[in-house]
């Protein structure tokens, strides 16, 4: 179920202040963040965020196509190593 339109997008407050400081300073640094649930806003375009996936901060460069999505969508939390090999066929 989608979020109500009248509520507006959810963004943690500290993200807005951090993004503002980086824009004012003109630096192109990675903004470390743990809020995977926050929505990507148009003012974040061009910035790079380090989205925490439970292990490390994954760098995510924000483009216009990402606006409206959540940060967590671009930092996968699970690694797939493939299915285990068949032990019976290995013995022979």
Curated annotation (Swiss-Prot):
GO cellular component terms, A-Z: cytoplasm; small ribosomal subunit
Name of this protein: Small ribosomal subunit protein uS19
InterPro entries per UniProt: Ribosomal_uS19, Ribosomal_uS19_bac-type, Ribosomal_uS19_CS, Ribosomal_uS19_SF
Keyword Transcription: no
This protein's record includes keyword rRNA-binding: yes
Entry similarity comment: Belongs to the universal ribosomal protein uS19 family.
Keyword tags: Ribonucleoprotein, Ribosomal protein, RNA-binding, rRNA-binding
NCBIfam families to which the protein is assigned, alphabetical: rpsS_bact
GO molecular function: rRNA binding; structural constituent of ribosome
SUPFAM superfamilies: Ribosomal protein S19
Domain of life of the native organism: Bacteria
């Amino acid at each position: 179920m989608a979020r109500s339109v009248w509520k507006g997008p959810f963004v943690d407050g500290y993200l807005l202040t951090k993004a503002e400081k980086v824009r004012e300073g003109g630096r192109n640094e990675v903004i470390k963040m743990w809020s995977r649930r926050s929505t990507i806003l148009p003012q974040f375009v061009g910035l790079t965020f380090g989205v925490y996936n439970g292990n490390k901060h994954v760098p995510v460069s924000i483009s216009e196509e990402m606006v409206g999505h959540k940060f967590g969508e671009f930092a996968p939390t699970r690694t797939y190593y493939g299915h285990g090999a068949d032990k019976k066929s290995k013995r022979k």
